[in-house]
Amino acid sequence: MANIKSQKKRILTNEKARQRNQAIRSAVRTEIRKFRAAVAAGDKAAAEAQLRVASRALDKSVTKGVFHRNNAANKKSNMAHALNKMA
């Protein structure tokens, strides 16, 4: 446990940020999972709609600093590739 007052505050701040990041990351992963399920089911219309939702969630998480922009771009690219393979 920290003894310095500012470090005690940082511990609290870091915990809040960790929980916020965890919630955002979990939501993004859920959207990606839904996209993969739509692709696996062979439902192209649902997959296209879910790709839009997942991409938007990824972009929002990048602006909040949860994912690195290159990591999000990679995930979006892989999802687009999976969607294009369905055709």
Curated annotation (Swiss-Prot):
It comes from Corynebacterium diphtheriae (strain ATCC 700971 / NCTC 13129 / Biotype gravis). Belongs to the bacterial ribosomal protein bS20 family. One of its GO terms (molecular function) is small ribosomal subunit rRNA binding. PANTHER family: 30S RIBOSOMAL PROTEIN S20, SMALL RIBOSOMAL SUBUNIT PROTEIN BS20C. This is Small ribosomal subunit protein bS20. Gene3D superfamilies: Ribosomal protein S20 (1.20.58.110). Keywords: Ribonucleoprotein, Ribosomal protein, RNA-binding, rRNA-binding. NCBIfam families: S20. Binds directly to 16S ribosomal RNA. It comes from the Bacteria. Pfam families: Ribosomal_S20p (PF01649). One of its GO terms (biological process) is translation. GO terms for cellular component: cytosol; small ribosomal subunit. InterPro entries: Ribosomal_bS20 (IPR002583), Ribosomal_bS20_sf (IPR036510).
